[in-house]
Each structure stands twice: as C-alpha cells, then as structure tokens.
Amino acid sequence: MGVETSSAWQALQLHSDSGMGSIHLSKLFQDTNRQDDYSLELSDVYVDFSKNRITQETVQLLIELAEQQKLPKEIHRLMTGEHVNDTEDRPALHTALRALGKDVSGGAETVQPEIEQVLQKMELMTKKIRSGHWRGYSGKPITDVVNIGVGGSDLGPLMITHSLQTISSPINLHFISSIDGTQTSNLLRGLKQETTLFILASKSFTTIDTLSNAETAKDWLKECISDERVIFSQHFIGVSTKPDKMQEWGIPPENQLMFWDWVGGRYSLWSAIGFPIALKIGMDGFRELLQGAHEMDQHFATADLKKNIPVILALIDIWNINFLNIHDKAILPYDARLRYLPAYLEQLVMESNGKSVARSGESVPYKTCPVLWGEVGPNAQHAFYQLLHQGTQAVMCDFIAPVERDDFDANSHTERDESLRHQHELALANCFAQSRVLMLGDNAIPSDLKASFDSPFKHYPGNQPSNTILIKTISAKTLGMLVAMYEHKTYVESVIWEINPFDQWGVELGKLIAKETYNAIKDKPLADSFDSSTKGLIDRVVK
C-alpha cells in the first residue's frame, strides 16, 4: 500500500475537503501577524511562504506526513552516503563535494581525500589559465574557453557564471550544448584557434551531443594545427568519470579532471564540472559557492522540520499538488542575471521527480512532479502573467530577488548609479506587487480605482499561491545556498512520494531510438519497426 492510503495522507485530504481547499488567501491575511508566522531565514536567504493556502493546522499535518515517511532518517541516509539511489545501487554524495572536509560522516567522510585532490588540481589549472601561463599552439595565452557539454554538464556552470557576470575575469567563457551545430558554427566564427581552449565535459564521455560538438571543434583546430598531440595537450581539457574514454579520445591524463559515478549530472556543478565557474570567479570564489551550499546542507541536516527551509517548501508543494490539485510551477527571478535559473531548475526538478513508478516498482496513483517553467519576472509580466492572473490554470510561483545590488556603488550619487538604484527598486516593487495581486486578486484594487475595474474582463480572482525568496545579493555564497535549497526540497518531495530522484531512465529510450533513426537518415534501409509518420519524415529529409 502506498502513501496515499496512510493515515497522515488521509488526514490532509480531509483537511482540504473540509474547507482549506477552497479558502481564499485574502481571508487568511486578515491575520496581521501572518507574514511573521510563515517565514524563515538562514543567513543571507529569507523565505516568505505566507502567500500559500495553509494554516498552522496544515503545517502540522504536513509535518506528521513527513515524520510518517521517516524523513529525518532519509535525510541522514542522504547526508552520510547511504545508497539512496536504489535503482542504480549508489549513494548520492553531491553534499560531500561541498563539505570541504568538515561536518561529514560515513561515506561522505570517506570520499573527502579524493574530492580535495581534484580541487587542488582544479586550482592549479585555474591559476595557470587565468594568469596567462596556459598557452595555445602559437605561444599566445588562452583568452577564450569554450565549455562543451549538455544537461548537467552545461546548465549548472552556465547558470552560475551568468549569474555572477559582474565579477571581472581575464577569461572569456562560452558554452556549447545543442546537438544541431548552430551554436558551434556561430561561436567559432568569432574565435581564434591560437587562443581558444575547449573543456569537454561529459559524465560518461559517450554523450553524442557533446562528442559531435567536440569533433567539430577538433576539426576547426586542425585548420591551423597539423599535430594532433598539440591540439589535445594545449587546446582540450576533459571532465568525466571515465579517464580511459578521455584518453582514448585523445585527452592526456594531465589535462583530465575527474568526478565520480555517485555524482548525478544535475547535481554536478559542485564537482569538476564546475571548472568553468572557477575560471570565471577563481578558486576562492568557487570555494565560497561550495561553502554557501554547505551552510544550507547543515541547516537541512540539523534544523527542526518546522524550521527547515527546504522541508517546509517541499511540504507546501506537496500540499498544493496533491491536495489542492495545482500541477504547474513558475520560477520568476527578478534580476536578469538569474536568467538561466528557471532552465536549471527545470532539469533539477523534472528530471529528478518526473517519475510515475515508486521505489517498490509499483505505479503511483497520485500526482508527482509539477510542470516547472519560468522566465525573468519583468519580462514574464509582458508574456505569460496574463495566464497567471486571469487564466484557467492554477499555478504555484516562486518569486526570487536580491535585496541589494553589487554592480554599482550604493553610496554614490552619480546619475548612473541613481538610475541603477531606481531600476532595482522598480524591479523589487514589481516583484512584491505581482505576488500581492496573485494572492488578493480584486481585493488588491485601491478603493478609489474600483469603479474603473467594474468589468468582467478586468476581474482578478487571485488565490494563486506563491513563495517569495529574498537573497541579500547575488554572490557565490547566496547562489550556493539557493541551489542547495532547491536540491534538498526536491529530495524531500521524492521521499514523500516514495520515488527515486537520482535516476533518469526516462531519457534513455529516446537516445537509443535516435541512433536507429540516424542510421535511416544516412540512407540505410528503414527499420520495419518505424511507424508511418517517422518513415514519412525521414523520406522528406533524405530525398
């Protein structure tokens, strides 16, 4: 029997059916202390979850569900390196990557020497490249580094480096991920072979998307370099769990950075996959990123469930999804530097929890992962906020914003800095206003304007739940805390739903069939198993 038949689940269902499922947020906000009672803070991260259809009774019932599912035990199992990835019989030790040798035990402690060894090699390579001592075939220093990867080998480093774009760096960073070659072709036209270095990042070192782009990059280098040994020794670095495959492709051991099978791709930015981050902000900055994540890890491992930020955020989403029937979630950062955060979280959340089979092997009869999407908030206001405010879909939202900006002098009164300060305040005002209108609907309309909204086409139902997450500023530390918070939130949800968040079998079949389809496109006989649609599409391509 699954969690849906348990006493804690049934109690929540009864709670929803008895009125909480239909109560309007405007009624809950008649309590003037509500915001204080439904917010949590850890260091530079503040979470306001008051704009959810919950009461103290709801929270208590959710905590009882977590305790019934043995959440404290499962947190301990994750943090100490037990095999929580049961379908692949592995631990998920991404938290060990950012422990920096402290506050760990069990399997997480055992792997610390290996982790530190890789960090030291990363530091040496980072210093060599950033200082201009890593040189290309002509003797000129490397000026441009291109990360070739996809999924976890791309999204994490891309998101973090874009978020920290205001930090100056001696290296120009670029990212290639798409298999179609357009990114590669467009980028290479603007680079010079003699000053370009490629990072080839792939956990398995068999990912066709990555290897096809790498082959194109190698062919581009061959236009100027006749000696392949020079290409691989001076213009390629490999990051993988497979040193033999890296060497087979041509990358020498001294240019290899290792990580391990117990690091999931979507949890790998803390490993050598984060090498581009170190190139952008230096190893001190990279360790600050790890430290921020570790601070959230310690909070997650030790805080009481009711005061535990990832736990509370996860349980609220469980409430919204399974008891209020809300199956969409929007991530809305109010700073353009966080542009890639929604895409990063799409992979983290949906590849982890987009499952319909429990750990037992049985199909689950309840909803699991929501469809997650998002955009930079100010841009989204002019795109899909119409749906959020007046559509037929119920949508949960996470509003995310920095309280302060660090890309101008806060004490300066130059016209430029005053303008930037004004823009930042406008962004925050829009962030807070949008969450308020989503919550209150028509009740947010000022009394002196109500007459002008007296039309069915100007009706705002409100009652859309949201969280507002404020970080002090966008820094390596706060990004580490923010990403770790979402990682742990995702894990908590998987524990409640009794699914494994650390495998991704759903992506394998498509890759397998793509190989068969590629052979057909290359003018080989069509497989009898092809359907008429696929046959017709191939025919249109190969004619």
From Swiss-Prot:
Keyword Methyltransferase among record annotations: no
Keywords: Cytoplasm, Gluconeogenesis, Glycolysis, Isomerase
Molecular function GO terms recorded: carbohydrate derivative binding; glucose-6-phosphate isomerase activity; monosaccharide binding
Role this protein plays: Catalyzes the reversible isomerization of glucose-6-phosphate to fructose-6-phosphate.
Main localization, broad class: cytoplasm
E.C. no: 5.3.1.9
Family: Belongs to the GPI family.
Protein known as: Glucose-6-phosphate isomerase
Gene: pgi
PANTHER family in UniProt: GLUCOSE-6-PHOSPHATE ISOMERASE
Protein location: Cytoplasm
Reaction equations catalysed: alpha-D-glucose 6-phosphate = beta-D-fructose 6-phosphate
Species, as recorded: Hydrogenovibrio crunogenus (strain DSM 25203 / XCL-2) (Thiomicrospira crunogena)
Gene Ontology CC: one annotated term: cytosol
NCBIfam families assigned to the protein according to its UniProt record, in alphabetical order: PRK00179.1 (NF001211)
Entries under Pfam families matching the protein: PGI
Pathway listed: Carbohydrate biosynthesis; gluconeogenesis; Carbohydrate degradation; glycolysis; D-glyceraldehyde 3-phosphate and glycerone phosphate from D-glucose: step 2/4
BP GO annotations: gluconeogenesis; glucose 6-phosphate metabolic process; glycolytic process
InterPro entries noted in UniProt: G6P_Isomerase (IPR001672), G6P_Isomerase_C (IPR023096), Phosphoglucose_isomerase_CS (IPR018189), SIS_dom_sf (IPR046348), SIS_PGI_1 (IPR035476), SIS_PGI_2 (IPR035482)
Residues the record marks as active site: E351, H382, K511
